[in-house]
Curated annotation (Swiss-Prot):
The gene is rpsG. GO terms for molecular function: rRNA binding; structural constituent of ribosome; tRNA binding. One of the primary rRNA binding proteins, it binds directly to 16S rRNA where it nucleates assembly of the head domain of the 30S subunit. Is located at the subunit interface close to the decoding center, probably blocks exit of the E-site tRNA. InterPro entries: Ribosomal_uS7 (IPR000235), Ribosomal_uS7_bac/org-type (IPR005717), Ribosomal_uS7_CS (IPR020606), Ribosomal_uS7_dom (IPR023798), Ribosomal_uS7_dom_sf (IPR036823). GO terms for cellular component: small ribosomal subunit. Belongs to the universal ribosomal protein uS7 family. Keywords: Ribonucleoprotein, Ribosomal protein, RNA-binding, rRNA-binding, tRNA-binding. This is Small ribosomal subunit protein uS7.
Amino acid sequence: MSRRHAAEKREVLPDAKYGDRVLTKFMNNLMIDGKKSVAERIVYNALDRVQGKLKREPIEVFHEALDNVKPSVEVRSRRVGGATYQVPVEVRPSRREALAIRWLIDASKKRNEHTMEERLAGELADAVNGRGTAVKKREDTHKMADANKAFSHYRW
């Protein structure tokens, strides 16, 4: 553990089309091998597909989907006297957002539509409607935390 102060967070620039910082973070997470233009094209085309599907403003749909995937509690392992307990802890806002983004992208990659645009559009639409793999991941995380509520006094 470093004794120096924590590294300061760098602020990402808002994206070109919607002027949204969270969308830029999403694109950066989706990006492979530094190919940002490819990631941008995938995200923008997916948002256009979602707009056609749901007849709503794409950036609103994106944020609603993200909110439906954000976990409020998670479990962290804690060793106490030779036993390891799964202790439920509240998730801080920055991690909440990061987890939601990661889960949406992972769930999209595992879908079986033909292109990544279709997969991402499908996962976003499902997340808005409260179903889909990413939402299930959040529900499972909450269930784990609820099941281990008895160990919440081991919080640190």
